[in-house]
Structures are given as structure tokens and as C-alpha cells.
């Protein structure tokens, strides 16, 4: 998995109040995003710039983030983000501290490879799940999960339960469909004639 370097400035957190709301609004107007780092010994509240997180957020790739908050370096993953519903602007980010002895759950992009038998017979290959949830130590999680579909016939599906990746535990439902070769009208017509 790729590493993304991100710098943040620590911030003091006060109990929920009008002063805190004003401070958060001022941060956002100043192109800063409030963030929190948890999962370690203590919870750390900090801010990052919008420009710094743009390449981290608006990409299909996944990263482990090397956070530098006031000089202290920590490895983390993006756990959650809150967006403004109308402008789609990032309002808040949550980071989970990771270590080599504790497994984390992440969504990893799925990539299909090969030419399915069902497609050769006139079907259409469709990807139902773009990402799969996996549980593993963060440095064992790949950038993408590659699934070979050469053996997938016409009208057949590939379910999560049929997949296995070394060192990863799949967290999705076993009967969830990852991809399928669907019958097209032309393929149905050919089957009816034949």
C-alpha cells in the first residue's frame, strides 16, 4: 500500500459550546479541516489544509497516512469523513492510528482481469462491488484486489465466499455478489435458437 505524507497542526478542544462552533467555522473559512486521530494511547485533535488532503481523498487509491502533528510522526488510515451535503466540501476527518501488531478493517478496490467465457458467448460482465472490506495488518493490505474472471460462464456470478486472498480476511457477506456475467438480448436469442 502506498504511503501519503500529511502535516497537521494540533488544536485545543473545548467542551461543546458556541465558542467551539465559531472556532470551527473560522478554521473552515481559513481552508483548514478539523480532524481527530484515535486508536493509540491518546486522542489528538488537529487541523489539516484542504489542499494537503485533496490527493488523499479524491482518488480511487488507498493509502496509509504518515501523519506529522507538531513534529510527532504517526502511521494512520482515514477511517471516516464528513461532507457538507450541498457543496460536497470536507467538514471533518477521522484518522485511525495503526500498528504492526493490530489488524485494521479497510475497503480495498476490486480489479477484474481476464476475459470471461460468458462474455465470449455474448454476455456482459458487470462489477457489482467496487470495493471489498478486508481485515489485516495494515502493511499486508494490497493497493487493489485482483480477481481473475476467465472461468466465469454465461449467467454465472462470483460471490465473496468463493474468493481467497493470502493474509486477508474478507468481511463482506459470503453470499454477496462481486461480479456477474449477465445475459444480453442477443445471447438470449442465440440460446433460444440453439
Swiss-Prot record:
Record-linked SUPFAM superfamilies: Ribosomal protein L25-like
Cross-referenced PANTHER family: RIBOSOMAL PROTEIN L25/GLN-TRNA SYNTHETASE, ANTI-CODON-BINDING DOMAIN-CONTAINING PROTEIN, RIBOSOMAL PROTEIN L25_GLN-TRNA SYNTHETASE, ANTI-CODON-BINDING DOMAIN-CONTAINING PROTEIN
Full protein name: Large ribosomal subunit protein bL25
GO molecular function ontology, one term from the record: 5S rRNA binding
Family of this protein: Belongs to the bacterial ribosomal protein bL25 family. CTC subfamily.
Presence of the UniProt keyword Ribosomal protein in the record: yes
Role noted for this protein: This is one of the proteins that binds to the 5S RNA in the ribosome where it forms part of the central protuberance.
Pfam families the UniProt entry points to: Ribosomal_L25p, Ribosomal_TL5_C
Assembly: Part of the 50S ribosomal subunit; part of the 5S rRNA/L5/L18/L25 subcomplex. Contacts the 5S rRNA. Binds to the 5S rRNA independently of L5 and L18.
GO cellular component, one term: cytosolic large ribosomal subunit
GO terms (BP aspect): translation
Amino acid at each position: 500500500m502506498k504511503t501519503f505524507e500529511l502535516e497537521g497542526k494540533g488544536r485545543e478542544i473545548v467542551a461543546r459550546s458556541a465558542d467551539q462552533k465559531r472556532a470551527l467555522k473560522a478554521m473552515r473559512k481559513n481552508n483548514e479541516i478539523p480532524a481527530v486521530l484515535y486508536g493509540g494511547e491518546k486522542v489528538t485533535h488537529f487541523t489539516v489544509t484542504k489542499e494537503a488532503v485533496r490527493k488523499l481523498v479524491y482518488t480511487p487509491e488507498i493509502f496509509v497516512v504518515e501523519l506529522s502533528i507538531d513534529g510527532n510522526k504517526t502511521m494512520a488510515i482515514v477511517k471516516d469523513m464528513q461532507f457538507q451535503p450541498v457543496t460536497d466540501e470536507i467538514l471533518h476527518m477521522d484518522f485511525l492510528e495503526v500498528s504492526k501488531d493490530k489488524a485494521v478493517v479497510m475497503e480495498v478496490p476490486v480489479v477484474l482481469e481476464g476475459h470471461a467465457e460468458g462474455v465470449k458467448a455474448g454476455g456482459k460482465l458487470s462489477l457489482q462491488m467496487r470495493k471489498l472490506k478486508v481485515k489485516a495488518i495494515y502493511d499486508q493490505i494490497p493497493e487493489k484486489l485482483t480477481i481473475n474472471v476467465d472461468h466465469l460462464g454465461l449467467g454465472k456470478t462470483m460471490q465473496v465466499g468463493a474468493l481467497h486472498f493470502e493474509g486477508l480476511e474478507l468481511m463482506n457477506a459470503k453470499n454477496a455478489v462481486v461480479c456477474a456475467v449477465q445475459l444480453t438480448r442477443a445471447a438470449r436469442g442465440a440460446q433460444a435458437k440453439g
